[in-house]
Amino acid sequence: MAKKNTKKDNKNQNLRCPIVCVLGHVDHGKCLMPHEKVLTEYGEIKIEDLFKIGKEIVEKDELKEIRKLNIKVHTLNENGEIKIINAPYVWKLKHKGKMIKVKLKNWHSITTTPEHPFLTNNGWIKAENIKKGMYVAIPRKIYGNEDFEKFIEFINSKILTNELIVKVNEKDLKNVELPSTKIYKKQKNVFRSEDIIEHNLNIEKISFSPRIHRCGKPQHYIKLPKSLNEWKAIFYFAGVMFGDGCVDRIANNDEEVFNKLKSLNNLGIEVERIKRKSSYEIIFKNGKNALINLLKILFDYPSEKKSHNIKIPQILYIAPKELVAEFIKGYFDADGYVNLRQNRIEVISASKEFIEGLSILLLRFEITSKIYEIKKSYKETKKKYYQLNIVGKRNLKNFKNIGFSIKYKEENLNKIIEKSRKSEKYPINKDMKRLRILFGMTRNEVNVSYYAKYENGKEIPSYEIVKKFLNSLKPKNLDKKIKVLEGKERDVNYLKAFESDGLIENGRLTKLGREALNIWKNHEFGKENIDYMKSLIENIAFVEVEDVEIIDYDGYVYDLTTETHNFIANGIVVHNTTLLDKIRKTRVAKREAGGITQHIGASEIPIDVIKRLCGDLLKMLKADLKIPGLLVIDTPGHEAFTSLRKRGGALADIAILVVDINEGFKPQTVEAVNILRQCKTPFVVAANKIDLIPGWNSKEGPFILNFNEKNQHPNALTEFEIRLYENIIKPLNELGFDADLYSRVQDVTKTVCIIPVSAVTGEGIPDLLMMVAGLAQKFLEDRLKLNVEGYAKGTILEVKEEKGLGTTIDAIIYDGIAKRGDYLVVGLPDDVLVTRVKALLKPKPLDEMRDPRDKFKPVNEVTAAAGVKIAAPELDKVIAGCPIRIVPKDKIEEAKEEVMKEVEEAKIEVDDEGILIKADTLGSLEALANELRKAGVKIKKAEVGDVTKKDVIEVASYKQSNPLHGAIVAFNVKILPEAQKEIEKYDIKVFLDNIIYKLVEDFTEWIKKEEERIKYGEFEKLIKPAIIRILPDCIFRQKDPAICGVEVLCGTLRVGAPLMREDGMQLGYVREIKDRGENVKEAKAGKAVSIAIDGRVVLKRHVDEGDYMYVAVPESHVRELYHKYMDRLRNDEKEALLRYMELMQKLTNNIFWGR
C-alpha cells in the first residue's frame, strides 16, 4: 500500500519547465557604416539619411540614439520570400574599433561591425568569420510601386517647380476666379505652379520659364502625359538620353531608336534625324526646352559631365514596371551590347553609382548581374569604367521581357538564350543531401543526371539542377527501407546506400540513422519542405566572397529594427540578433538528442543541453537540476511579459532583466523592474556587453571561470567592479532591491543575482542558464508541479491568420494536458467563447534535415509547459492575453466559470470621467492602466483593440465636458483609417507608442502644457486690477470721449477696463490707450499714457487733475485672482488687488468682499 502511495506521490511531483521571459535592453549592436544603402520600397537610401528622416526620438544618450522610422524595407521572411515590411526603428550607435568590409564577386560590398551576421549557404555567419570563397545571399527580386495613381501624385509633386508654366483644360477656366491684376493669366490660359495648387487645376500642357519672364510670354508647350502609354514615350526617351544623350540631343545611328522616339510627336515635340558625316543625330524641335527640363526634374539628369554624373533616379522605383522597362530598353538600345561569344549582355558606364544602381533596379525584373571595373583608353590615358554583365539562362529570359527595339540586338538575344544552358549556381550541396534523406531516397533514386557530383561538392548545382532535384523528391519504398534500417529485412543495395549516407556504421544505426528512421516512421516530411526550398531559389541567389578587409573606425554606425531581423543593404541580405538568440543557441550545427525544441512562440531548452553547457559549473557548485528544462518566450520585452497573464499574476515563472553594464538603467529598465515588482515575479539581471568593458578578455564559456587575475588585467577587473556597482547595483538599490554579483550572493531570496554576459562572445550564458534553472527549481517547486491528469490551462500569446487554417491562436499552456478534439474555452472581455479544437500544431524539429522554421505538424496532445498553435472555428474575436482552457465536454461549465473569474479580475476599474485607453492585449492594457494611475490619470474607458471611429466620437463627447479628457492613449495598436478622419475633425489628441513609460511620459507632459494653456487662457480673460492718477495739466477733452493723461501707479491698465472713482461711482470704460502717440493695448505700473474714456464721465466735474481712478474689477474676478492666480501677479499687481479689495470692503461694509 505504501509503495502504491509513493508511486502516486512521485507522479504528482512531476515538474514542468519553468516559463522564462526576457525584459530590458535586448538590442543587438550589429550595425552598418553610415554610407551603406538600405533598399526601401522607393529605392536605395543611405542608412544615415534614414536616421535623419526619423524625427521622433525614442531613446537617447551619449552612446546611442533610437528614433521612430516606420519606413518599408525589403527583407527575407521565414518562408524564404523577399517581401516589403515596416522598419519601425532606426539606431545610431557610437563605435570605436574594427569594421569588416565584405566584397562579393558581383562587385557589391558592405562594411559592418564584426558581429553582424550574413546569410550564407551554411546559415548565418558573423562578418568576422566570413572568408574569401564563402557564398553570401543576395536578393533575386525586389519590388517597387505598381500603383499608377501614386506614380501620378509623385509626378505632380516633382514638376510643381518655380519655373513651371502650364496651360490647363479649357473647361476648368470657367471656374477660375482671379483678381484683376492676374486676369491676363486666365485670358491667355497660362499659369504658374502656385495657381495650380491654389485653384486645383488640371494640367494640360507644360513649359518652363524663369520668373524674370512674365508667364504670358509665348512658349513652346508640350502635353503632360496622362496615360501609361503616353508616359512610355518619356521613359524610353530618358533611357536613350542616359545612354547616348548629351545636353539636348542624341548621337545614335539606329533607325529603330529614331522610329520609337517619334512617339514623342504625340506630346507636341518634333523629332528629327540628321546625318553628320558618318553618323546620325536625333534632335528635338518646338518642345525641346520643356522636354529637357522634364528630364532633369523627373530623372535627375545632369546638366554637365553626363557620363560621370548619371545615377538611378527615384522615379524608377515609384513608376510601374511597364514604364521602368521602357527606360531600361532605351538605355540598352543606346549602350547595350549582346556578346555572342560569351553569351551575355553587356553595358559600360563611367558612372560607378549608376551601374551599381542599375544592378539593383534590374532586380525588379528578377535579373541578377555582375559588375567589373575595367580600364579604357581615352585621349591617350587609361580611364576607369564599370561594366555590368547579364549572364545565365534565367536572367537572359527575364531580360527578354524587357527586350530591345533594335532588331539585330533582339535577334542576338534570342541566340544567346538558346545557347545558354545554365543559370546561377546554388552551393547547397549539404541541403540537397539532407532533403534527400528526409524524403527517404537513395542517391540512385534521384532523377538528376550525375547527381552524385553535386551532392559530393565536386560541382555546384545550377538553378535548373536544383529545380529538377526538388521536383524529383518523392519517398520510394519507404516501408521496406524502414524494415531494412531496423534490421527486420535485408537488402544489400539499400544497406550500401544507407552506409554511404552515414545512417549505418559497422552494422549499427548512427545518430543520424536513428533520426532518419524516426522521421520516416512519423512521415515528418511533406510538400512544404520542397515549397520552402523552391521559394528560396526563386527569391535569393548566392554570390562568392571575393575579398574581406578589416578597417579601423571611430564614429557612428547604424541599424534598423525589423520583424524578420534582417533587411537588404547594398544588395546583400544582412541580419541582426539579440541576447535571446544566444540563450537559445546550441553549439552544434546539427540536431542532437535533447537539442533545443521549437514551440509556438517559445523555445524549450532541455535540461540535457543546460547540463552540457553548464557542466563545469554544476560540478563546481554541486548543483543537481531536476526540472525538464526551460521554456523561453521568444518575444522579448514588456509586450510579451504583460500579455502573458494568468490568474494571480504573470504567467512567467521567472524573468531575465537585460541591462547594458556600460550604460546602466534606462527609463524602460525602471519600468520593467516596476512591472516585475507589481507582478511579484522573481528575476535575475543579465549584465550584458561585458565584452565592451575596456581591456576585458571575453570568451565563450562560464563567466565565473574567466573572472580572475589570470585571465583579466587588474585594470579591467577594476573597471568591471565600478560599472557593476554604478550602473546596476546602485540603481537597483535605489529601487528598493539588494543586488550583487551572483557568486557573492548568500541569500538569493533577499538579494537579486547579477550574471555578467556577452551576447557577442557567449561569455556568461552557462552561468545565466544555470542560475535561472537553479532558482526556478529551488524556490518555485510548488508552482512547477505538473497536473498530469488535469485539463489544460493557458494564455493566448498571439492571434494569426494561417494559410489553409484560417484564424489560429498561438498559446502558452502552463498547466495540464491539451487534447485534440476537446473544447477550447476562451475568456473574452465581455463574453466566453466555446469552440471545438480542430488541431493542435507544433513546429517540426530543427533537425539534421534543416526543415523550414514555421512549418507545423499536428499532434494529439500537448503537455505543459509548452507553446502550441490551436486551430478552431470562430476565433475571429479572440485577442492576445485572453485566458484559455482546453477541456472535455463535461468540464465546459466549470472552465467557463474559471475564465470568467480570470477576466473579471483583469478588468480595469474606470472612473466617472477621464480618458480612453487602448492596448493590444489584456495584460498590456492592465500594465498601461497601472502606470497611468500612478501618474494620477483618470480613466473613463479601457479596451483592447485598434483605435476605431467609435472611440474617437466617444472621446469627442468627453472633451466637451473637459478639454483635458479629449485624448486617447494607445499602446501597440493601430489607428484605423476611418478613425483618422474623425481625429482631425474633432481635434482629438492620440498618443501612440509601443513603450509604456514613453506613452505615460508624453501624455502627462501634454496634460501639464494643456493645463497651463487653459489656466493662462482663463487668467487672460480676467479683468486685472490697476490704480491710476490723472496727471496735472493733462485733461485734453472733458467728455464723449473724455481724454486725459494718467500715470499707472500699480497694476496693469488695459483697453476695455471699467473705471470707478474712489467712492465707487462708475465712470465708464477705457476706449483707447496711447503711449507717445502710438496705440497700445495695455500700460503697466510706472507708465504715463493718455487714455480715452467712454461713458458718462465728465472730466473736471466727476474727476479732476490729481484724482485717483480704480479699475472696477468684478468680485468674481477678484476671488479668482486672489485664490487661483496670485502667483501669476506681479508685486505691483498684487498691491493694486489688495488696495482695491480693502477699498471695496469699506464701501460695501463687508470684510469678506472678494475673499
Swiss-Prot record:
PTM field: This protein undergoes a protein self splicing that involves a post-translational excision of the intervening region (intein) followed by peptide ligation.
SMART domains: HintC, HintN
Keyword field: Autocatalytic cleavage, GTP-binding, Initiation factor, Nucleotide-binding, Protein biosynthesis, Protein splicing
GO cellular component: cytoplasm
Family matches, as InterPro entries: Cro/C1-type_HTH, EFTU-type, Hint_dom_C, Hint_dom_N, Hint_dom_sf, Homing_endonucl, INTEIN, Intein_C
Residue ranges constituting the tr-type G domain according to the UniProt record: 561-781
GO molecular function, a single term: GTP binding
DOD-type homing endonuclease domain: residues covered: 237-367
Residues at which GTP binds: 634-638, 688-691
GO biological process, one term: intein-mediated protein splicing
A Pfam family recorded for this sequence: Intein_splicing
Miscellaneous remark of the record: The intein interrupts the GTP-binding site.
Family: Belongs to the TRAFAC class translation factor GTPase superfamily. Classic translation factor GTPase family. IF-2 subfamily.
NCBIfam families, per the entry: aIF-2 (TIGR00491), intein_Cterm (TIGR01443), intein_Nterm (TIGR01445), PRK04004.1 (NF003078), PRK14845.1 (NF011418), small_GTP (TIGR00231)
Family matches, as PANTHER family: EUKARYOTIC TRANSLATION INITIATION FACTOR 5B (PTHR43381:SF4), TRANSLATION INITIATION FACTOR IF-2-RELATED (PTHR43381)
Purpose: Function in general translation initiation by promoting the binding of the formylmethionine-tRNA to ribosomes. Seems to function along with eIF-2.
Protein name per its UniProtKB record: Probable translation initiation factor IF-2
UniProt source species: Methanocaldococcus jannaschii (strain ATCC 43067 / DSM 2661 / JAL-1 / JCM 10045 / NBRC 100440) (Methanococcus jannaschii)
